[in-house]
């Protein structure tokens, strides 16, 4: 998933079964496969990949037209799953919120008194966020949550810019 073009072949000799995993386009291929039974809001998922000398973020996102609890929501840091999210996920949500707020305010789409919050935007979304950075700081030994504050602003900025252009 996080290494586009990498093929993994698993052979279960006891059951004489073979399974092949290959995501030619990385996150996009994974998102398409994972959402094959979902009625998506937009035809093509929003895909982004941005890197600097010290950090990188890649994400793919789409939304389900129907309320579902079983949607793919995954985050990674340096190929390590981060089920509790952390600063990269918070930056992603912040960027989504900023872009949507900007869009709605510019077009006067928000009713007076209605306040958007990030959780509303991601609540029915299907996404994968993958970050790579030097010397990541994790909260705890299990590496379930990233705690690198500088990376949050990078991810937020990249996410907002990507959605603003989209």
Residue ranges and their predicted role:
Residues 2-143:
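GHKL/Histidine-kinase-like ATPase module
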Residues 15, 148-149:
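Long, charged, helix-prone linker segments
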Residues 150-166:
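Flexible helix-coil linker/hinge segments at domain or subdomain boundaries
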């Amino acid at each position: 998933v996080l290494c586009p073009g990498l093929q993994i072949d698993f052979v279960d000799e006891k059951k004489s079964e073979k399974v092949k995993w290959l995501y030619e386009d990385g996150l996009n291929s994974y998102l398409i496969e994972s959402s094959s039974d979902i009625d998506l809001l937009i035809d093509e998922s929003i895909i982004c990949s941005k890197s600097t000398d010290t950090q990188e973020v890649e994400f793919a996102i789409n939304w389900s037209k129907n309320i579902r609890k079983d949607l793919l929501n995954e985050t990674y840091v340096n190929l390590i799953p981060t089920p509790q999210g952390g600063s990269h996920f918070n930056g992603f949500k912040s960027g989504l919120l900023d872009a949507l707020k900007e869009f709605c305010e510019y077009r006067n789409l928000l009713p007076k008194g209605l306040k958007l919050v990030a959780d509303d935007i991601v609540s029915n979304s299907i996404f994968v966020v993958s970050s790579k950075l030097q010397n990541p700081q994790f909260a705890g030994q299990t590496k379930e949550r990233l705690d690198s504050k500088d990376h949050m602003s990078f991810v937020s900025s990249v996410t907002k810019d990507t959605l603003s252009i989209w």
